[in-house]
Amino acid sequence: MSDQQLDCALDLMRRLPPQQIEKNLSDLIDLVPSLCEDLLSSVDQPLKIARDKVVGKDYLLCDYNRDGDSYRSPWSNKYDPPLEDGAMPSARLRKLEVEANNAFDQYRDLYFEGGVSSVYLWDLDHGFAGVILIKKAGDGSKKIKGCWDSIHVVEVQEKSSGRTAHYKLTSTVMLWLQTNKTGSGTMNLGGSLTRQMEKDETVSDSSPHIANIGRLVEDMENKIRSTLNEIYFGKTKDIVNGLRSIDAIPDNQKYKQLQRELSQVLTQRQIYIQPDN
């Protein structure tokens, strides 16, 4: 029964607005407390922003940079609140983490023109793993509010030769938009999308891990953007057009009347015009 309840709960969460995930998740846990751990580990939540007091830069919070009640900043590598024995990446991986944060900071500025990004890496037995987080929220200046949250979890398995690596990327994007205009009123549109991909890439000085991961994330985000634009927003536009006619109703009625008259004329011509013997 618990497996069926979990499947139903996850299916319900996929259909609810992303901007209300925390409230809906809390309500579900109150209804079925036994699903608490499974739901918290399975449902991606909107990213929260914190401020690194050491360097004065924002960073994003998630389970991957949390240890107890403290979160590690990718900029200063310090936990807030301070934690003496918190989990830390190895020296080699920390150097890679710093480079990745600088690279994706530029990527975020180029593609999103604002927002906050963070990259966290951790060691594995035969390689390493990491998460790339990007958050961009609209300020509502054009009567449009919204938020984009993308979570890219990548696992890197380094081959024994050291010249190639296997990359496994799992990406989740949560997007919601809200418009409030005099002509159309208030409209909410949102959803989440998760995609996976795996690929082997050459690792060299000209194509290091950061470049390979960057290309994978860039390709994945472009595909997800295209899917959201063509399927979700495109389908919504079709539904709205089906509910509300763009043309004025009187003009539409005149067009249908003209169709009927033309049909009658053509029918009469078929009856009275006989072929020559």
Curated annotation (Swiss-Prot):
This is F-actin-capping protein subunit beta isoforms 1 and 2. Isoform 1 is detected in pectoral muscle, cardiac muscle and gizzard. Isoform 2 is detected in brain and liver (at protein level). Isoform 2 is the predominant isoform of nonmuscle tissues and isoform 1 is the predominant isoform of muscle tissues. GO terms for molecular function: actin filament binding. Keywords: Acetylation, Actin capping, Actin-binding, Cytoplasm, Cytoskeleton. Belongs to the F-actin-capping protein beta subunit family. One of its GO terms (biological process) is regulation of cell morphogenesis. The keyword Iron-sulfur does not apply. InterPro entries: CapZ_alpha/beta, CapZ_alpha/beta_2, CAPZB, CAPZB_N, F-actin_capping_bsu_CS. Component of the F-actin capping complex, composed of a heterodimer of an alpha and a beta subunit. Component of the WASH complex. GO terms for cellular component: brush border; cortical cytoskeleton; cytosol; F-actin capping protein complex; hippocampal mossy fiber to CA3 synapse; lamellipodium; membrane; postsynaptic density. Transmembrane segments: none annotated. The modification N-acetylserine is found at residue 2. F-actin-capping proteins bind in a Ca(2+)-independent manner to the fast growing ends of actin filaments (barbed end) thereby blocking the exchange of subunits at these ends. Unlike other capping proteins (such as gelsolin and severin), these proteins do not sever actin filaments. May play a role in the regulation of cell morphology and cytoskeletal organization. Pfam families: F_actin_cap_B (PF01115).
